[in-house]
Amino acid sequence: MANAHDTHHEGNHGSVKSYMIGFILSIILTAIPFGLAMSPSLPKNLTVLIIVAMAVIQVVVHLVYFLHMDRSKEQRNNVWTFLFTTLVIALLVGLSLWIMFSIHFEMLAK
Protein backbone atom coordinates (compact mmCIF):
# COMPACT_ATOMS: atom_id res chain seq x y z
CA MET A 1 0.00 0.00 0.00
CA ALA A 2 2.89 2.35 0.65
CA ASN A 3 3.96 2.20 -2.98
CA ALA A 4 0.53 2.93 -4.47
CA HIS A 5 1.74 6.17 -6.04
CA ASP A 6 4.91 4.84 -7.64
CA THR A 7 3.53 4.81 -11.16
CA HIS A 8 4.26 8.13 -12.78
CA HIS A 9 3.71 9.02 -16.39
CA GLU A 10 6.90 10.57 -17.65
CA GLY A 11 5.87 13.22 -20.15
CA ASN A 12 8.02 15.22 -22.47
CA HIS A 13 9.58 17.64 -20.05
CA GLY A 14 11.75 20.30 -21.58
CA SER A 15 15.43 20.69 -21.06
CA VAL A 16 17.11 23.80 -19.72
CA LYS A 17 18.12 24.64 -23.29
CA SER A 18 14.50 24.39 -24.44
CA TYR A 19 13.30 26.64 -21.63
CA MET A 20 16.04 29.19 -22.31
CA ILE A 21 15.19 29.31 -26.02
CA GLY A 22 11.53 29.86 -25.13
CA PHE A 23 12.44 32.52 -22.58
CA ILE A 24 14.69 34.43 -24.98
CA LEU A 25 12.09 34.25 -27.77
CA SER A 26 9.45 35.51 -25.33
CA ILE A 27 11.63 38.45 -24.34
CA ILE A 28 12.27 39.34 -27.99
CA LEU A 29 8.59 38.95 -28.89
CA THR A 30 7.69 41.25 -25.98
CA ALA A 31 10.41 43.84 -26.64
CA ILE A 32 9.48 44.39 -30.29
CA PRO A 33 5.86 45.49 -29.62
CA PHE A 34 6.98 47.47 -26.58
CA GLY A 35 9.52 49.34 -28.69
CA LEU A 36 6.95 49.99 -31.40
CA ALA A 37 4.48 51.35 -28.86
CA MET A 38 7.05 53.57 -27.13
CA SER A 39 8.47 55.12 -30.30
CA PRO A 40 5.68 55.42 -32.87
CA SER A 41 7.74 55.57 -36.05
CA LEU A 42 5.41 53.41 -38.16
CA PRO A 43 1.82 54.12 -39.20
CA LYS A 44 -0.74 53.18 -36.55
CA ASN A 45 -2.37 50.40 -38.61
CA LEU A 46 0.97 48.74 -39.31
CA THR A 47 1.98 49.03 -35.65
CA VAL A 48 -1.23 47.32 -34.52
CA LEU A 49 -0.77 44.60 -37.13
CA ILE A 50 2.80 43.91 -35.99
CA ILE A 51 1.77 43.85 -32.32
CA VAL A 52 -1.03 41.36 -33.03
CA ALA A 53 1.32 39.20 -35.11
CA MET A 54 3.91 39.19 -32.31
CA ALA A 55 1.18 38.21 -29.82
CA VAL A 56 0.10 35.26 -31.96
CA ILE A 57 3.71 34.14 -32.43
CA GLN A 58 4.29 34.45 -28.69
CA VAL A 59 1.28 32.23 -27.97
CA VAL A 60 2.78 29.59 -30.26
CA VAL A 61 6.18 29.93 -28.54
CA HIS A 62 4.56 29.42 -25.14
CA LEU A 63 2.59 26.41 -26.36
CA VAL A 64 5.67 24.75 -27.85
CA TYR A 65 8.44 25.63 -25.39
CA PHE A 66 6.59 25.85 -22.06
CA LEU A 67 3.51 23.64 -22.46
CA HIS A 68 5.39 21.18 -24.72
CA MET A 69 2.58 20.87 -27.25
CA ASP A 70 3.84 19.30 -30.43
CA ARG A 71 2.69 16.81 -33.06
CA SER A 72 3.71 13.73 -31.10
CA LYS A 73 1.19 11.01 -30.29
CA GLU A 74 1.49 11.73 -26.57
CA GLN A 75 0.35 15.33 -27.05
CA ARG A 76 -2.49 14.64 -29.49
CA ASN A 77 -5.21 14.82 -26.80
CA ASN A 78 -3.77 18.03 -25.38
CA VAL A 79 -3.64 19.66 -28.81
CA TRP A 80 -7.25 18.70 -29.61
CA THR A 81 -8.38 19.93 -26.20
CA PHE A 82 -6.59 23.23 -26.76
CA LEU A 83 -8.11 23.64 -30.23
CA PHE A 84 -11.61 22.87 -28.94
CA THR A 85 -11.17 25.32 -26.06
CA THR A 86 -9.97 27.99 -28.48
CA LEU A 87 -13.01 27.39 -30.70
CA VAL A 88 -15.42 27.62 -27.75
CA ILE A 89 -13.84 30.85 -26.48
CA ALA A 90 -13.83 32.38 -29.97
CA LEU A 91 -17.51 31.49 -30.40
CA LEU A 92 -18.38 32.82 -26.96
CA VAL A 93 -16.62 36.14 -27.51
CA GLY A 94 -17.67 36.54 -31.14
CA LEU A 95 -21.32 35.72 -30.62
CA SER A 96 -21.49 37.87 -27.47
CA LEU A 97 -20.14 40.84 -29.43
CA TRP A 98 -22.62 40.14 -32.22
CA ILE A 99 -25.50 40.13 -29.73
CA MET A 100 -24.31 43.35 -28.10
CA PHE A 101 -23.97 45.15 -31.44
CA SER A 102 -27.39 43.90 -32.53
CA ILE A 103 -28.96 45.14 -29.30
CA HIS A 104 -27.16 48.46 -29.69
CA PHE A 105 -28.54 49.01 -33.20
CA GLU A 106 -32.03 47.91 -32.15
CA MET A 107 -31.98 50.45 -29.30
CA LEU A 108 -30.86 53.21 -31.68
CA ALA A 109 -33.72 52.50 -34.07
CA LYS A 110 -36.40 53.20 -31.45
Swiss-Prot record:
Pfam families: COX4_pro. One of its GO terms (cellular component) is cytochrome o ubiquinol oxidase complex. It is found in: Cell inner membrane. Residues 40-46, 100-110 are periplasmic. GO terms for biological process: aerobic electron transport chain; electron transport coupled proton transport. The chain crosses the membrane at residues 19-39, 47-67, 79-99. Keywords: Cell inner membrane, Cell membrane, Electron transport, Membrane, Oxidoreductase, Transmembrane, Transmembrane helix, Transport. Its main location: membrane. One of its GO terms (molecular function) is proton transmembrane transporter activity. InterPro entries: Cyt_c_oxidase_su4_prok, Cyt_o_ubiqinol_oxidase_su4, Cytochrome_c_oxidase_bac_sub4. It is a multi-pass membrane protein. It comes from the Bacteria. Residues 1-18, 68-78 are cytoplasmic. Belongs to the cytochrome c oxidase bacterial subunit 4 family. Heterooctamer of two A chains, two B chains, two C chains and two D chains. Cytochrome bo(3) ubiquinol terminal oxidase is the component of the aerobic respiratory chain of E.coli that predominates when cells are grown at high aeration. Has proton pump activity across the membrane in addition to electron transfer, pumping 2 protons/electron. This is Cytochrome bo(3) ubiquinol oxidase subunit 4. The lineage of its organism: Bacteria, Pseudomonadati, Pseudomonadota, Gammaproteobacteria, Pseudomonadales.
